From Swiss-Prot:
Keywords assigned by UniProt, alphabetized: Ribonucleoprotein, Ribosomal protein
Name used for this protein in its record: Large ribosomal subunit protein uL13
GO MF terms held by the record: mRNA binding; structural constituent of ribosome
Originating species: Spodoptera frugiperda
SUPFAM superfamilies reported for this sequence: Ribosomal protein L13 (SSF52161)
GO cellular component, one term: cytosolic large ribosomal subunit
InterPro entries attached to this UniProt entry: Ribosomal_uL13 (IPR005822), Ribosomal_uL13_CS (IPR023563), Ribosomal_uL13_euk/arc (IPR005755), Ribosomal_uL13_sf (IPR036899)
Length: 204
């Protein structure tokens, strides 16, 4: 993930631990890369749900007594929770930190055009690698829903639609590969001399 690239790294948030994923993203952003995180509602937090909800409710009580509109601002959406976690790991008040944070995009669900893009995972932040089997964890989506996020059902509905569409696309691509392979086998004898010439130039 090192080096500069105009193309964004698309990360699938499903099954990652919030803090560990945010730490990796912060480092990558400061190196100059663009990062897009999809399916933020399926990011995990270690510890049982009740404990995490109590911590979040305690955070909701933190406000300015004189004028609460001054902040701190309590984001409920999973994508904004991830964004704020990453912000805490970046020197966001400096110009370098501001530009790094501008390179981050986080989404609930998997909107176009990222539904057709290749998505990657971060092994160092995956729950199955970081937590012992049997340890308790909860989903950011459930926590957000319980503290005021209103779009869980909408995101679920759109995700189900996307998955059905994805299965159909996979079946079509599989069929297309099979037809292409069969067509190649049919004309293999006819095209053998031409194939030999092409391979002599180093192409396969």
């Amino acid at each position: 993930m090192t080096g500069f690239s105009n193309k964004a790294i698309v990360i699938d948030g499903r099954g990652h631990l919030l803090g560990r994923l945010a730490a990796v993203i912060a480092k990558v952003l400061l190196e100059g890369n663009k990062v897009v995180v999809v399916r933020c509602e399926q990011i995990n937090i270690s510890g049982n749900f009740f404990r995490n909800k109590l911590k979040f409710m305690s955070f909701l009580r933190k406000r300015c007594n004189v004028n609460p509109a001054r902040g701190p601002f309590h984001f409920r959406a999973p994508s904004k929770i991830l964004w704020k976690t990453v912000r805490g790991m970046i020197p966001h008040k400096t110009e370098r930190g501001k530009s790094a944070l501008r390179r981050l995009r986080a989404y609930d669900g998997c909107p176009p055009p990222y539904d057709n893009r290749r998505r990657v995972v971060v092994p160092a932040a995956l729950r199955v690698f970081c937590l012992k089997p049997g340890r308790k964890y909860c989903h950011v989506g459930r926590l957000s829903h319980e503290v005021g996020w209103k779009y869980r059902d909408v995101v679920r509905k759109l995700e189900n639609k996307r998955k059905v569409k994805s299965v159909k696309l996979m079946a079509y691509e599989k069929k297309l590969k099979r037809i292409t392979k069969e067509s190649g086998e049919k004309v293999a004898k006819t095209t053998a001399p031409f194939t030999a010439v092409i391979q002599s130039y180093g192409y396969n």
